[in-house]
């Protein structure tokens, strides 16, 4: 596994990796595998059906282990479609850290479309973190279009955190989660756009089983002339509980649309949605400025706290 300074910076940004990961990992770089390691309980293998990507199989009862599967692109002009499938056994408790970083110093677009599908066994808990980051001084675009599909069996839970740090010119995120009996999905989405960037998020959580629970927490900041559109949808098909909360800060000449939807197909479904868009309150800025912060520092402090 050979790493340049650019590689190291991208891996630290998107996966908090410094040096070789501990445990199971697969590092994808510029369409190829730059390093892979399995463990006794987590097996990572390349696709055998002609598609690009990997299969991750986690044994029943695996607890306290991490699996890192970051993707980095360091060359302009790369366009890739990757399929990663996760088969998680019963009674597991694992952390999966993904993410994609694009460094583009050229004139051609670089694009990563990643399709992740999770099959989570009974009474297993998965924490899944996915961060996106882009940099480089080229004129070519940095484009990411992730798709995540999750199937939760009885009593299974997933805690999903998706973060777009900065530097992604265009993204369309699609998320679908199906919850069985007593299953729970908690999705936290954090996003910042600036310049003329465009971000769209289409999310659907289907609460199919009795006792299923779903929660969506979306927080975003739009600066410059950037554009954000959110479509979170919670469907209650049994005795279940679902909550959607979308909060956004709009600045400059940006545009934000937040269109939450709740759909009940059972008289026993309890569903709530909340959405708010606003600017930074002037009294918040003034308070921090009286403590010695410049207007720019005060603004940055508020935004960090909001997205934390």
Positions of PLM-derived features:
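C-terminal functional modules
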Residues: 1-27, 31
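Conserved beta-strand/loop scaffold segments within soluble protein domains that form the structured core
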Residues: 24-29, 33-286, 290-293, 303-308
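Sequence-level preference for short, compositionally simple segments enriched
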Residues: 1, 287, 296-297
């Amino acid at each position: 596994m050979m790493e340049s300074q650019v590689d190291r910076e991208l891996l630290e940004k998107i996966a908090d990796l410094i040096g070789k990961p501990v445990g199971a990992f697969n590092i994808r770089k510029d369409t190829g595998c730059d390093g892979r390691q399995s463990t006794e309980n987590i097996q990572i293998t390349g696709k055998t059906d002609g598609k690009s990507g990997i299969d991750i199989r986690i044994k029943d009862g695996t607890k306290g282990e991490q699996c890192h599967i970051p993707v980095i692109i360091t060359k302009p002009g790369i366009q890739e479609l990757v399929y990663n499938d996760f088969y998680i056994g019963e009674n597991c408790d694992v952390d999966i850290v993904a993410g994609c970083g694009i460094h583009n110093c050229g004139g051609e677009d670089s694009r990563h479309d990643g399709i992740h599908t999770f099959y989570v066994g009974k009474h297993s808990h998965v924490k899944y973190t996915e961060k996106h980051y882009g940099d480089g001084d080229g004129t070519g675009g940095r484009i990411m279009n992730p798709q995540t599909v999750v199937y939760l069996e009885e009593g299974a839970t997933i805690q999903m955190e998706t973060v777009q740090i900065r530097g992604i010119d265009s993204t369309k995120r699609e998320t679908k989660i199906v919850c069985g009996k007593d299953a729970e999905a908690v999705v936290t989405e954090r996003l910042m756009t600036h310049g003329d960037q465009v971000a769209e998020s289409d999310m659907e959580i289907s609460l199919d089983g009795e006792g299923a629970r779903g929660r969506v927490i979306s927080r975003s900041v739009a600066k410059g002339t950037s554009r954000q559109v959110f479509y979170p949808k919670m469907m209650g098909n049994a005795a279940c509980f679902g909550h959607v909360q979308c909060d956004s800060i709009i600045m400059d000449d940006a545009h934000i649309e937040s269109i939450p939807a709740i759909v009940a197909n059972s008289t026993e479904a309890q569903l709530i949605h909340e959405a708010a868009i606003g600017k930074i309150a002037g009294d918040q800025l003034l308070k921090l400025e009286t403590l010695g912060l410049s207007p720019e520092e005060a603004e940055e402090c508020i935004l960090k706290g909001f997205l934390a």
